[in-house]
Structures are given as structure tokens and as C-alpha cells.
Amino acid sequence: MTSCTITSAPGKVLVTGGYLVLEQAFWGCVVSTSSRFYTIIQAQSKPNHISVHSPQFEQADWTYVVTDDFKLKAVTLDSANKFVETALSFTLQLMVEKQGVGKVQEVLKTGLDITIVGDNDFYSQRPQLQAKNLSNTAEALASLDPFCSTHATLATVHKTGLGSSAALITSLVAGLLLHFGMVEDVTSEMSKRWIHNVAQFIHCFAQGKVGSGFDVSSAVWGSHLYKRFNPAILKPIMDEQVDSKLLLDTLHVDNTEWDNQVVPFNLPPGFDLVLADIDAGSHTPTLVSKVLNWKKTKPEEASLLWTELNECNSKVEARFRNLIRLSEQSPEEYKSTIELCSSRLFYQWSSAEGQVAVELLDLHDEFDRVRSLLRKMGELSDVPIEPKEQTQLLEACMQVPGVVMAGVPGAGGYDAIFCIVISERAKRDVRALWKSWKELSVGPLLSEADSNGITSPQTNQIPGLSRFIL
């Protein structure tokens, strides 16, 4: 145990595999972001007390007493946080079973003071910008203090769709396991599996359902190709009164029933992600339930479309891999082609010579086909996966030189878009387009692609974090 434990988990963007990742037959391509959640765990003076603070929110302080039988008793009764309480309760239960009563009691002697903060990109910063009389630009966002106040409660804040709940849960679970000594290094493969299994269960329990799990998976492993675990593994323990031995046996890293698959993935050199927050949110569970209802009532129609969509998703992933291979085999040709194509529109790339240009254009074309199939699925299921307003914006983004692809992440809807670009200039030009766009209120996020998963950083590595250290 150390006096101060810091853990961090990234947000995510599901580039391909929206809806399909719900089933074990299909892969999804998830890119983790530079925007991250941080959990800071420190000792406090009150034995067996756990205080949790979310300083970016109003009414976001919770205090608990750990009883003699390691149950959590809330001291603050005016508000509750299902995610935090679920994480603390089950993680304590698990650690007592795994490490024994003595070890856990030893750590709790000094109590725990837990602070959880997320990078600004997880939440819409429009209210802060308006209060400062600033326009919604990347430059204005960069001028805000790190981890700035949202001036909202957890219930009223506008999220940007980067997977805040999964990143929060994963960083908190990792922090607890590290602080209590159940894992020693969060970046080791064994530790990642512990963190994943525990965080996956807690996230599902807090949400009241077993989801696809790609968001927790990317919070642990960073960017990767993901194939989900069999949801049946969690069914026996989705119970508040779950037996401790059953809980440990189910979540144990030696349990071979955990059959999730993680294949490392990176964007090719010179590629980056640009994200936008759109001021018209979609409720993801509603979109998903409507699509699944269509799939249930029209199984043949859905199966044909999902099979074709999966093939197109696989082709997109293959193009990415081919470009990485070419960057290693012919680095000079790769670099010069990327530079040339970065100043041209996608349909002009065919005039560039060599295999790199061929793969680049094929990547665009394959992803365009993915978008077309997602729109078709939206029409058949009567779900706005890529609404017409988004289509117009995405097509305009594709008219910016150096933009390889533009789409709606994950389940789609109205609240976000992403572009993958091959130059800083393309990034600036896309953001300029968003600023001038009149049909929707489009604001940039500062997040970039960052393939790192769970980490345990030093305070001085993260600007603005030191103010939360006691």
C-alpha cells in the first residue's frame, strides 16, 4: 500500500462495430482517446471511513462507513451515486475474500479519501465558454482550466459520449485494487485482466444490464479490436447479496469462461482522430433497444445486413493494418504519399502512385460502404443511426483535403461525429468547417487518438491534478 494511489483510464470511440459488438460473432474496432479519468486515493484521519469527491460537480461528495462485516453504510443521505457505491461495495467484498480480513482492515485503519476527476472533453463545456464570453473553438477550450467545474449535477450534465461511466469505473476499480495491494502494477497483463473482469461486472451491475463491454475493455487495454465475452458469465452474480466465494470464482483471472478477445490496434502513422460534440443528445440505450427489437421481429433481414456490415467492417480494419505494414516496409514512400494526399481531396488520391495511395482510397471507400449500411439499418429499424443532418455534415467534412473518413461513433445518433485525418491542417480545416456550420451546433473536442489503456501516472505528469492531493 502507498499513501497516495493514482490511476487513470481513457475514453473511447467505436470506429467500426456499432451494434454488432453486442454479439460474440462480431468484432469492433475501438480507439481510445487522450481524454482520461483519474482516481486519487489517499489516507484520511477517520478509520473505516471512505469519502468520495467529484469536485467537477455540484452535490457530489459522499461519505461511507465500512461496518465490521465490510458492508458500506452511507453517512451522506441527501444524494447517492450508484456507480461509486457499487464499485466500493463489490470491490471490498472481493478483496476480503481474496486477501483476507486482516489485509483489508489494515488499509481501512487510516480510512480512504477518494477524488475522481475527468478531463474536460467528457462533458460539454458550452456553459463555461458562454460564461467567459468565449466562442466554441479548440483555442477557447484549451484556455479552460483542467478538470474545470461543470456547474451541473451528475444528473443534469451534458455528456459528450466518450464513455465517462466506463472510464470512471475502470479507474476507480484499478485504484482500489492497487491501493489495497491486490494488484502491483496496473499495466501488467495479469493486473489488466483482474481490473477488466471486476470493472466489467461493476459497470454492468450499476447499469442494470450486461452490455457489450467494449467501453470498459478499451478503458483497460486502450485501442484494440474487440470481441465480447459471453454475457452468461455474469448472470449468477448479478445479485446484491451475491456469495463472496462465487463472486471471486467468477471474476478470477483463472476463470476460463472469460472468453473476451483483445487484439492490439493502432491508427497508422500520421493518422489522427478529430471529434465533435453536437448539441442535440441521443439516448444510446433507446437507439440500441429499437435496433434489437427490429432484429428480433425481422431476423432474416437483419442477419443479411449484419453479415454484410461485418464484412465491410473487417475490410476497414484490414486497410488500417495494410497501411501500418506499408509504413514499416516502405517508410519513405509511405511518408511522401501521406504528405501528398494530405493536401488533396479523397477522390484525387487515385492520381498518386503506389500501393499506399491505393490502400488509402480503398480505406475511404470501404468506410463509405459501412456508413451506407448503417443508414440502411437506420431506415429499416426506424432509428436515426446517421440522421440526415449528420449525413450533410459528414459529407461536408469529406470535402476537406486530408480527411480519410468521417462518421458517427458507436450506436450513432445526433450527439457526436468523428473524422480521421492525415494532417494537422486537415484537423484545423475540419474544425473551421464545424465553427461555420449553421444547420447544427457543432463544437470541437480536444481529444486525440491515444492507444494507451489503464495507467498509474505521477501527479507531476498531469497538469492540474496536484490541487486534488491532500
Set out the residue ranges of the language-model regions.
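C-terminal nucleotide
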Residues: 1-16, 20-22, 30-113, 117-158, ...
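DPxDG-like acidic metal-binding loop motif
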Residues: 161-184
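FabD-like malonyl-/acyl-CoA
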Residues: 167, 416-418
